UniProtKB/Swiss-Prot annotation:
It comes from the Eukaryota. Belongs to the Wnt family. It comes from Plethodon jordani. This is Protein Wnt-5b. SMART domains: WNT1.
Length: 116
């Protein structure tokens, strides 16, 4: 005749797109660091704020993904197809790294499997 209550708590991941956008934002604002003579990390540019525990930091520059680099496994972007009208990652301006690009049109003929 006694009563009891039950509470359940759980954690749930945010939407995958939101997680990706958040990580990209952190990546884009990561702080460049170097190791000083005492073996401690310090900012490369002291004009920026000291990073918090929530910020990303790096000591090495990212490779140039526009160029082929066998040591990193990057194939570069030379010869890849791009979308002239896109402003995203697949857009020609970004993907071609300012080198310019060739334009061409293709006609694609496919069977439509239509039924009448």
């Amino acid at each position: 005749s006694g009563s009891c209550s039950l509470k359940t708590c759980w954690l749930q991941l945010a939407d995958f797109r939101k997680v990706g956008d958040h990580l990209k934002e952190k990546y884009d604002s990561a702080a460049a660091m170097r190791i000083n003579r005492k073996g401690k990390l310090e900012l490369v540019n002291s004009r920026f704020n000291t990073p918090t525990v929530e910020d990303l930091v790096y000591t090495d520059q990212s490779p140039d993904y526009c160029l082929r680099n066998e040591s990193t496994g990057s194939m570069g972007t030379l010869g890849r197809l791009c979308n002239k009208t896109s402003e995203g990652m697949d857009g020609c301006e970004l993907m071609c790294c300012g080198r310019g690009y060739d334009q061409f049109k293709t006609v694609q003929v496919e069977r439509c499997h239509c039924k009448f």
